[in-house]
């Protein structure tokens, strides 16, 4: 299985990768995108099983990438790991088809709890 990690912070992508490994998902193919547009393009080209996205990124936000993917008929499991969390953001994410919304800081246990049902 393939997991796409989209975040404009290289350090945060590394932290998400490390936490995925700690949660037992290290055997998955982990690929990275540095902004929302790249996440959109890579999702269409690489066909990941899961997209873990930051909310605020240059070029295109994570929410804009999700909306654009859904409009194009792509139903990849997509959700957010972000430091910002408001009820409005969560409602927008759910309305766009987000599978999860994880608030930073996060733990390997939280990743396991959220991603095990998604990845099987």
Q: Where do the PLM segments sit?
A:
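Active-site residues of response regulator receiver
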Residues: 54, 82
């Amino acid at each position: 299985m393939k997991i796409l990690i989209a975040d404009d912070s290289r350090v945060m992508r590394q932290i998400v990768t490390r936490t995925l490994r700690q949660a037992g998902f290290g055997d998955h193919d982990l690929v990275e995108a540095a902004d929302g547009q790249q996440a959109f393009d890579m999702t269409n080209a690489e066909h990941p099983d899961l997209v873990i996205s930051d909310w605020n990124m240059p070029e295109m936000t994570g929410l804009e990438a999700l909306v654009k993917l859904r409009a194009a008929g792509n139903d990849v499991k997509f959700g957010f790991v972000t430091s910002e969390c408001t009820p409005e953001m969560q409602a927008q994410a759910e309305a766009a088809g987000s599978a999860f919304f994880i608030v930073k800081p996060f733990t390997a246990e939280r990743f396991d709890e959220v991603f095990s049902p998604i990845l099987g």
